[in-house]
Amino acid sequence: MTATTAAALLLILAVCDLALFPSLIMLLRRSGFTQLIREEGPDSHKTKAGTPTSGGLMLLLNVLVVCLVYVAVTRGHGLSRIDIAALLFVAINLLSGFLDDWLKERKHRNDGLLGYQKILIQTLAAALFFAVGNPGLRGSVSLGATVLLSGWWFFVIAMVYAVGMVNAFNLTDGLDGLLASTSLPVFAVAMAEAVAHPSGLAGLLPAAALAFDIAFLWFNGPRASVFMGDTGSLALGSVFVAWTFASGQELASLLVGGLFLVEALSVMIQVSVFRLSGRRRRVFLMAPIHHHFEKLGWAENKIVARFFVASVLFVLAGVLVMTAWR
């Protein structure tokens, strides 16, 4: 797909999303898909109760459109095993996120799927992704001419990475506009890389995510009119993971998605220290780390703006790795 075609597709998707979001928001509100707030969360979040959620459903439409356009451009001869694996991976995580949002609405509390159920579904989705896409995956990670990881170890680490990164995106979705704004430069670079070095439909899925982010920010900026819910956050993480392995940018993705890894690591550190200290010590006032800054008194829009800047810096560092060791 040429840069012109990709840009036109992105523009059309973003404009269509902007036009369709008001109807989706109304539908979600009427269907009872509204946000429930945890009691232990920051006090400022309690005013957000009742906001429509599961706005990530719009991303499903974008993925379908990108898929149809790709099939049309390649005349039906371009779909590879990796592309099919990527579509399955994104679809399973998006639907599991929607199920989680739906269960929260049905139970009338902020607890949908149990933690182990989420991890099990995500692990199965990742296993399916690598099983279906394996013949077309490189199966190794290299730095220049040096092979750092290969064989079974590659797939073991890749599974952990896939599940971890999907959850990292989910953990970042905690403030109005935070995940959409921080993932926007990530998907912009991923899309540019996919156009410069084509890697099939899986490589173009970031275009669907980028268009979603652009439109979603219009309605999710403080104060939010809609939340993406687990439906959106898990799907965005899945798109990033699919692009990572389809493009062979495993090392660079650690930097491109660095901000999300920081969010996930803050939770891991907090939980580990809390348990090892006999529930007496915490490293952060609250985890993920964006809530730590909330507790310090930072305004929500300041946190979002500064995390966006941090994400841009991580992405630029990732671009250096992409260009230096491709």
Model-derived features: positions:
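"…together with the soluble PPM/PP2C metallo-phosphatase catalytic core" -> "…together
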Residues: 2-262
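Short flexible/disordered coil segments
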Residues: 100, 287, 323-324
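Short linear loop/turn motifs
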Residues: 39-46, 303-313
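Membrane-proximal soluble regions of multi-pass membrane proteins
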Residues: 22, 29-38, 258-306
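Juxtamembrane boundary at the C-terminal end of a transmembrane helix
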Residues: 317-326
